[in-house]
């Protein structure tokens, strides 16, 4: 079977990448930008780094900031109405996954108005038209939403997150500039970085993995393992490594899928507003152990990429343990909690387990879980 790979038309990487935004806008004949960015980025003048460039070149824009950390159906609906009134012809998404996901949903609904209820786009979205052109400017090194065909929206009423997968939503241009990530506090750097590591490890071991996505994901594991500690301390080398590593795994997992770490984490975000990266980081080692017998020798590769020495001489049991231990050590070093005791209420475990079973990421897991197994995984983390 042929493997499909979908990537940005164009991407810019490295310090100063955002300086190419105005040139790209002019080359494409765009007239007015709908700048989608969350309130904190506006408050701390991160968004201003981009709007100053637009101002300098006399390019029009309008800012939309009704975005929550876990974007909701309401955020999307109000964004669609704001875009219609703005007269904009492209979107500049500035931020982490929240801004990117909101932008994708808005852009898709604008060009596919028959799907005005974003819930109708869950799973493999049946759209026919490419979304409003998006320029993506990530400010976190984690979600890689600037290069993926996925977006996640929270249904507050039903207390669940749902994943939409649509080749029509990928940003046309990504500007991956580590300078845009330098204002991230340590905690956010750690959680988004562990989100990226989860993408890479799940992507490398998912059922849909192939030789191309493996190349992206394995190199991403190596870069993230080398760079995250430095990024948390805000070193230039660490920021640069994370910017590239998280983008590489975006190129990978977007084209092969994820697994039950994300299925379980989505429920925590919807029910408790738990930061997505924190939820992933806590769950990842336990799910790696659960999946260990279903992924062949891939955990040997993971252990080596994580920096473990002597993996070629290790027994199967040794390299599996080494891979899990290396992930646990990195998570501990960057300050991630070890368990879900302070997050999950015992009475919610059944609901969370069923949510994970219903999640779009679950079928890609290398081992097919039953409800009781998911429940046991949650309980083991409490």
Can you describe what each PLM-predicted range is?
Residues 18-21, 43-46, 73-76, 99-103, ...:
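Short glycine/serine/threonine-rich phosphate/pyrophosphate-binding segments
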Residues 299, 309-382:
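C-terminal charged capping/lid subdomain of soluble metabolic enzymes
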Residues 267-306:
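Catalytic phosphate/nucleotide-handling subdomain of diverse soluble enzymes
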Residues 150-256:
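Carboxylate- and glycine-rich phosphate/diphosphate-binding segment that chelates Mg2+/Mn2+
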Residues 1-64:
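An N-terminal, well-structured beta->alpha segment
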Residues 74-179:
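Glycine/threonine-rich beta-strand-loop-alpha-helix active-site module
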Residues 42-115, 229-239:
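N-terminal small/polar loop signature for handling phosphorylated ligands or for N-terminal nucleophile
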């Amino acid at each position: 079977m042929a493997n499909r790979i979908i990537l940005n038309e164009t991407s810019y990487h490295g310090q100063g990448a955002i300086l190419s935004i105005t040139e790209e806008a002019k080359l494409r004949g765009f007239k007015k930008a709908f700048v989608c960015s969350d309130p904190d980025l506006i408050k701390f003048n991160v968004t201003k780094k981009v709007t100053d460039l637009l101002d300098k070149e006399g390019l029009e824009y309008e800012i939309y900031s009704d975005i929550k950390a876990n974007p909701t159906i309401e955020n999307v609906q109000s964004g669609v109405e704001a875009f219609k009134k703005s007269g904009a012809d492209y979107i500049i998404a500035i931020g982490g996954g929240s801004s990117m996901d909101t932008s994708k949903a808005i852009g898709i609904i604008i060009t596919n108005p028959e799907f005005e209820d974003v819930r109708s786009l869950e799973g493999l979205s049946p759209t026919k038209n490419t979304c409003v052109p998006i320029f993506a400017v990530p400010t976190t090194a984690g979600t890689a939403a600037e290069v993926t065909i996925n977006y996640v929206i929270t249904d507050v009423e039903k207390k669940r997150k749902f994943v939409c997968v649509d080749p029509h939503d990928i940003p046309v241009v990504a500007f991956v500039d580590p300078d845009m990530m330098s204002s991230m506090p340590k905690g956010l750097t750690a959680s988004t970085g562990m989100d990226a590591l989860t993408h890479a490890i799940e992507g490398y071991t998912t059922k849909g993995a192939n030789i191309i996505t493996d190349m992206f994901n394995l190199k991403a594991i190596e870069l993230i393992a080398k760079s995250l500690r430095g990024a948390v301390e805000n070193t230039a080398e660490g920021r640069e490594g994370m910017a590239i590593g998280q983008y590489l795994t975006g190129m990978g997992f977007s084209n092969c899928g994820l697994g039950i770490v994300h299925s379980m984490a989505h429920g925590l975000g919807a029910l408790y507003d738990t930061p997505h990266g924190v939820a992933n980081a806590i769950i990842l080692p336990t799910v790696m152990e659960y999946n260990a017998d279903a992924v062949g020798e891939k955990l040997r590769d993971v252990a080596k990429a994580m920096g473990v020495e002597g993996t070629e001489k290790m027994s199967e049991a040794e390299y599996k343990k080494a891979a899990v231990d290396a992930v646990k050590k990195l998570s501990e070093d960057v300050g991630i909690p070890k368990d879900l005791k302070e997050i999950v209420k015992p009475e919610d475990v059944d609901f969370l387990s069923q949510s994970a079973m219903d999640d779009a990421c679950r079928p890609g897991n290398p081992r097919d879980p039953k409800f009781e197994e998911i429940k046991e995984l949650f309980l083991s983390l409490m």
